[in-house]
Amino acid sequence: MDNIEQDVKVLRKVLNGPLFLDKYPLISRVWVEEYGTNRIDIILNVKDPYSEYTPLRDEIKSYIYNLAKMLGVTTRFIIYP
Protein backbone atom coordinates (compact mmCIF):
# COMPACT_ATOMS: atom_id res chain seq x y z
CA MET A 1 0.00 0.00 0.00
CA ASP A 2 1.34 3.41 -0.98
CA ASN A 3 1.87 6.12 1.60
CA ILE A 4 -0.97 8.23 0.15
CA GLU A 5 -3.34 5.25 0.31
CA GLN A 6 -2.43 4.67 3.95
CA ASP A 7 -2.94 8.37 4.75
CA VAL A 8 -6.38 8.32 3.08
CA LYS A 9 -7.36 5.22 5.04
CA VAL A 10 -6.27 6.71 8.38
CA LEU A 11 -7.87 10.11 7.77
CA ARG A 12 -11.12 8.56 6.54
CA LYS A 13 -11.39 6.39 9.65
CA VAL A 14 -10.56 9.13 12.17
CA LEU A 15 -12.53 12.00 10.59
CA ASN A 16 -15.68 9.87 10.29
CA GLY A 17 -15.34 8.60 13.85
CA PRO A 18 -16.61 9.93 17.16
CA LEU A 19 -13.35 11.74 17.97
CA PHE A 20 -14.10 14.27 15.24
CA LEU A 21 -17.85 14.10 14.54
CA ASP A 22 -18.83 14.31 18.23
CA LYS A 23 -16.56 17.30 18.72
CA TYR A 24 -18.10 19.12 15.74
CA PRO A 25 -21.75 17.96 15.46
CA LEU A 26 -22.49 20.49 12.70
CA ILE A 27 -20.48 18.24 10.35
CA SER A 28 -22.43 15.14 9.36
CA ARG A 29 -19.84 13.34 7.22
CA VAL A 30 -16.35 13.70 5.84
CA TRP A 31 -15.17 12.48 2.45
CA VAL A 32 -11.47 11.76 2.10
CA GLU A 33 -10.35 11.13 -1.47
CA GLU A 34 -7.01 10.69 -3.19
CA TYR A 35 -6.49 13.37 -5.84
CA GLY A 36 -3.87 12.41 -8.36
CA THR A 37 -0.64 11.01 -7.00
CA ASN A 38 0.36 13.65 -4.50
CA ARG A 39 -2.69 15.18 -2.80
CA ILE A 40 -5.70 14.31 -0.68
CA ASP A 41 -9.00 16.20 -0.79
CA ILE A 42 -11.02 16.38 2.43
CA ILE A 43 -14.63 17.45 1.91
CA LEU A 44 -16.75 18.32 4.94
CA ASN A 45 -20.52 17.82 4.70
CA VAL A 46 -21.85 20.72 6.78
CA LYS A 47 -25.39 20.57 8.18
CA ASP A 48 -27.69 23.54 7.70
CA PRO A 49 -27.52 26.34 8.53
CA TYR A 50 -24.11 26.91 6.98
CA SER A 51 -23.81 30.19 8.91
CA GLU A 52 -23.09 28.18 12.08
CA TYR A 53 -20.04 26.62 10.39
CA THR A 54 -18.47 29.86 9.17
CA PRO A 55 -17.22 31.15 12.57
CA LEU A 56 -15.72 27.71 13.38
CA ARG A 57 -14.14 27.06 9.98
CA ASP A 58 -10.58 28.06 10.95
CA GLU A 59 -10.78 26.15 14.24
CA ILE A 60 -12.00 23.00 12.48
CA LYS A 61 -9.32 23.20 9.79
CA SER A 62 -6.63 23.75 12.41
CA TYR A 63 -7.93 20.76 14.38
CA ILE A 64 -7.77 18.56 11.27
CA TYR A 65 -4.21 19.69 10.45
CA ASN A 66 -3.05 19.04 14.02
CA LEU A 67 -4.82 15.67 14.12
CA ALA A 68 -3.21 14.65 10.82
CA LYS A 69 0.20 15.66 12.15
CA MET A 70 -0.31 13.53 15.28
CA LEU A 71 -1.40 10.59 13.10
CA GLY A 72 1.76 10.86 11.01
CA VAL A 73 0.03 11.87 7.77
CA THR A 74 2.69 13.11 5.37
CA THR A 75 0.63 13.62 2.20
CA ARG A 76 -0.41 17.17 1.36
CA PHE A 77 -4.15 17.75 1.68
CA ILE A 78 -6.76 20.44 1.07
CA ILE A 79 -9.92 20.89 3.13
CA TYR A 80 -13.21 21.97 1.52
CA PRO A 81 -15.32 24.06 2.19
List each model region and its residues.
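N-terminal presequence-like segments and adjacent domain-start helices
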Residues: M1-V10
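Long, terminal "pre-/pro-" and other extracytoplasmic accessory regions
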Residues: D7, K23, E52, I78-I79
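Short, aromatic-enriched amphipathic alpha-helices that serve as compact interaction elements
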Residues: L11-L15
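A short interface-forming secondary-structure element
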Residues: I40-E59
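Low-complexity, intrinsically disordered Gly/Pro/Thr-rich segments
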Residues: D58-N66
